[in-house]
Amino acid sequence: MKGWNVIVIGGGHAGLEAAWAAAKFSRVALLVGNPATVGRMPCNPAVGGPGKSQLVFEVQALGGLMGRLADDTAIHTRMLNASKGPAVQSLRVQNERDAYAERAQDVIFGHSEIEIVRGEAADLEQDGQGGWVVVTSDGRRLHARSVVLAAGTFMRGVTWYGRQSRPEGRQGEPPSRFLSAPLERGGHVLKRYKTGTPPRVRADSVRFADLLEIPADPQPRGFTGTPGPRAAESPTWQTHTTPQTHALIQENLHESPMYAGDIEGLGPRYCPSIEDKVVKFAHHDRHLLFVEPDGVQTSEVYLQGFSSSLPPRLQDELVRTLPGFEQAVIQRYAYAVEYDVVDSTELTLNLESKKLPGLFTAGQLNGTSGYEEAAAQGLVAGTAAARRSLGLDEQVIGRETSYLGVLLDDLVFKGSDEPYRMMTSRVEHRLLVRQDNADERMTPIGHALGLVDDAELIRVQEKYARVQSGIKSLSKQRMQGQTADAWLRRPELSLADVETLGATLPAELGASEREAVEIRVKYAGYIARAESQLRSEAKARELSLSGVNFAGITALSNEAREKLTRLQPQTVEQASRISGVRHADISALLVHLKGQRVGS
């Protein structure tokens, strides 16, 4: 009887990170239906963006894969929100779609501690000794101490093209027919969610001269550092819907399975279909769309923002109402997919089932959307599964430490009634958990977890020692009656501007270190206030709410007032864990408690 410490089911972004992380501890089996699909980007050919790049930087700092794969296959990089503060600046990397999957397969298939097992998981059984048996559809029984289930959109998956449906997990791939049953048998309540993907259009049928070109940033950036020169680059482009697009959709809503009532699953609020945009935002006369190449020498482009479940013949008409797409030929049609998800409040903060110990879940199965959210969960689940299999202590990544901590905390304590997407607005202390300091924050955590080796920890520590040296150097240099750091704190001046005034930094500082110096000096006051607020909130969360009349606190949102009155939490910490109670509501509670103390 062959066994492993961990079996990972599914080779998407969550499964990749889970297998990679678990393999740092012991031998792992990666069970996939078709190894050729491992690491595929089934939706947009890009990584990062607001709220998402921060997760990728954190995964990278924890020893994960996604940032490295994205950098290795990048064809276009842009820093989004570059004109805003560092708390919301977010890297977005456009990737060569096929190359990304090929690179992922090279890394995973070449790993000495990861065994690729081909087959379909048909059942999950507890072995009576704290371990698990994965039963395949051809009758094999695979034994492991822990299992990570990362089934994506495949569990009882159904794709929709207009009113026609097919049993698929995604286009052309069969669903997971059996895995929902053992979860339900074990007491899990499953929900149905829905997502969608846009059409892919033949690149040679698009008039790119009629589109707005979006060039890459002049200086390429990456998740793993400053990348070297690329073999090839490509711009992206922008177009938009027209009144003709909107009219055609309105006239044919009866052919949408969502509006006809065929689809039961809840769709993503922050990534709506083009039908939803036209119906829910009818006051807009156009919606921006982004045209993204699948690669430099690609034969097709991806129409970001145009996901749809309308029938193919209508998609042909709709796409040709867009500027630059009048002669467009669709190579692969858009579709919606409906699938099972677990209730994430039935998981621990390490994504282990509270009902089925030793079973971990990650990715879209947990009700999230997006590659980045999936990768982050996969790393957590794979690490926790491996540590459990070896009898090691649990380690929890706290909400205050990272975007990853917020993601876990939201899933477990708040849950979601729709596909969850990470955004900067979900993070209370985002000035402290920026993408630029992810390595400083997360590398020590990765080292403590066993994911990062001593050499990497020392490298990061030495990097930030150089950063501190640079900051100290600026504080000692005077120009025109002021220190260099005082000049740098002026909002209109950059570090380069201050250097033209005569300031110098140690020559050994690299680009990322210079950026860290600039951010820490320029935003020193804001950062200090945020740190003070975080310390105050940590103390405040221990405050008692016993006897508080929540119904009488008018500053609370209606939802928070109703839930607090019904659930009667005894501490601020407990109140903050209730779904629908937001950071603003907690602040209102703290103001109320302070007023009570003053009044008494």
UniProtKB/Swiss-Prot annotation:
GO terms for biological process: tRNA methylation; tRNA wobble uridine modification. Keywords: Cytoplasm, FAD, Flavoprotein, NAD, tRNA processing. Residues 216-239 are annotated as: Disordered. Belongs to the MnmG family. Its main location: cytoplasm. GO terms for cellular component: cytosol. Gene3D superfamilies: FAD/NAD(P)-binding domain (3.50.50.60), GidA associated domain, C-terminal subdomain (1.10.150.570), tRNA uridine 5-carboxymethylaminomethyl modification enzyme MnmG/GidA (1.10.10.1800). NCBIfam families: mnmG_gidA. NAD(+) binds at residues 267-281. Pfam families: GIDA, GIDA_C_1st, SAM_GIDA_C. FAD binds at residues 10-15. NAD-binding protein involved in the addition of a carboxymethylaminomethyl (cmnm) group at the wobble position (U34) of certain tRNAs, forming tRNA-cmnm(5)s(2)U34. This is tRNA uridine 5-carboxymethylaminomethyl modification enzyme MnmG. The keyword Cytoplasm applies. Homodimer. Heterotetramer of two MnmE and two MnmG subunits. It is found in: Cytoplasm. GO terms for molecular function: flavin adenine dinucleotide binding. Its cofactor is FAD.
